[in-house]
A protein has these predicted regions:
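A Zn2+-metalloprotease active-site environment signal
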Residues: 3-8, 18-214
């Protein structure tokens, strides 16, 4: 993404002292610079920029289908309380990502690439897993000492993932410093995606089919 404005609320949150929250997935307490309210605020502020950059795919039937599928998965997740938003972006890139607070995106490119609804559910479940496990907030907390400007870029890089999008954010946000999710976070998102598939009567082995795509 060439430009994604950073909400003022994120800067304020990053400048504040850490709070303690309970991770919804692990049940363990963790120190964080982003509580749930801050996650939701960040996602809400960033969402219009994502849609403005890519454009929403102009097919209401497809949008409704993906939203209904995503909502079913989210209702069986560890953070069913969030107001989840699922959007198909008008991009040929094979990509999917999520912002803190329950904003999940898949491109028309990845939808064309996948073979089945179960595979699409696996992709969406993986991204839901990043949100439910608070991976963006964890990355922000670990990077706190890097400075607010660099940290802001790392948060966006973490939630948007590697590849062209992250590279473009890096160029505009903080001198090329953008970090992706860690291997452990990706593995946890895979495991959560498989769990959410099983909870919705899909074969969890479909996660194996989509791991290479993600």
């Amino acid at each position: 993404m060439r430009f994604l404005s950073l909400p003022i609320v994120l800067v304020a949150v990053l400048a504040a002292s850490c709070a303690t929250v309970v991770n919804p997935v692990t049940g363990e307490s963790e120190r964080t610079v982003m509580d749930e309210a801050a996650e939701v605020a960040e996602g809400k502020k960033a969402h219009p920029g994502v849609v403005a950059e890519y454009g929403a795919y102009n097919n209401p039937r497809v949008q409704n289908y993906v939203n209904e599928l995503g909502q079913r998965l989210a209702r069986q997740s560890h953070r069913a309380n969030l107001q989840w938003t699922f959007t198909v972006l008008d991009s040929p890139e094979i990509n999917a990502f999520a912002l803190p607070g329950g904003y999940v995106y898949v491109t028309r490119g990845i939808m064309a690439y996948l073979d089945s609804e179960a595979d699409l559910a696996g992709v969406i479940g993986h991204e839901i897993g990043h949100v439910t496990a608070r991976h963006g907030a964890q990355r922000a907390t670990r990077a706190q000492t890097a400075g607010i400007g660099v940290l802001a870029a790392s948060v966006l890089g973490a939630v948007l993932g590697v590849g062209n999008v992250a590279g473009q954010v890096a160029q505009s946000a903080a001198a090329g410093y953008v970090a992706s999710y860690s291997r452990d976070q990706e593995l946890q998102a895979d495991q959560l995606g498989a769990e959410y598939l099983a909870r919705n009567r899909y074969n969890p082995s479909n996660m194996v089919d989509v791991i290479g795509v993600l």
